[in-house]
Amino acid sequence: MLAQATTAGSFNHHASTVLQGCRGVPAAMWSEPAGAIRRHCATIDGMDCEVAREALSARLDGERAPVPSARVDEHLGECSACRAWFTQVASQAGDLRRLAESRPVVPPVGRLGIRRAPRRQHSPMTWRRWALLCVGIAQIALGTVQGFGLDVGLTHQHPTGAGTHLLNESTSWSIALGVIMVGAALWPSAAAGLAGVLTAFVAILTGYVIVDALSGAVSTTRILTHLPVVIGAVLAIMVWRSASGPRPRPDAVAAEPDIVLPDNASRGRRRGHLWPTDGSAA
């Protein structure tokens, strides 16, 4: 008897607070944590709101409740605060569930089917490209004729007629221009670079031709041999512009609508932290 009295006297003040008004607690539970004693009290006596909300939270999560559902429902019918809490938490849980269901379902990734990239279709040959192709062939033929030493209108007074090396350089340059013209006619993407080179070359060559023509150092036949380069420069610009396509008009791009913010909102990155305004569901 003395040992039992000693054991009963050693049970702590917190447990006695939990067991206040609770009847029928076995002596073996006196050493259990306060939460276990409180749940036991909820099954045999009036239920604490914290225990009821814990059981309701478990019900929403599909977990096993710590106390019988009948006792929870009985407490819920008597406690208006717990009813309001349960209504709010159930609404939030439904919103989260609908939000999760509205997200698109990503199908599982299977075996990656590697396919060959489709071959790039060449654009049809336009008259500009055909003309540039013909001019390039004519330029190659002109350079070849000059390379074989045939008369292409050079005079002895012309600076290139005095040196064989300068003549060879002129021949190489003429043939190279013809090859690039043919390439730009077949692949219009190369016409941009060709147009820039030929435009600069024709501008500088025109100055030399005018000076040599005034001094009588160049014949009319030699001047006519420069026409393929001039025509090629014009055609290269035309092919380049037709291949690049029309540029979009500035007014054709739709302006993005401005974001309308609430009156109490401010632009910029939020510096503070978000804190919950209600208690935890658990």
Curated annotation (Swiss-Prot):
Gene Ontology terms: cellular component: peptidoglycan-based cell wall; plasma membrane
Subcellular location: Cell membrane
Transmembrane feature ranges: 130-150, 170-190, 191-211, 223-243
Pfam families linked to this entry: zf-HC2 (PF13490)
Keywords assigned by UniProt, alphabetized: Cell membrane, Membrane, Transmembrane, Transmembrane helix
Topological type in the membrane: Multi-pass membrane protein
Domain of life the protein comes from: Bacteria
Chain segments carrying region Disordered: 263-282
Protein name from the UniProt record: Uncharacterized protein Rv0093c
Taxonomy of the source species: Bacteria, Bacillati, Actinomycetota, Actinomycetes, Mycobacteriales
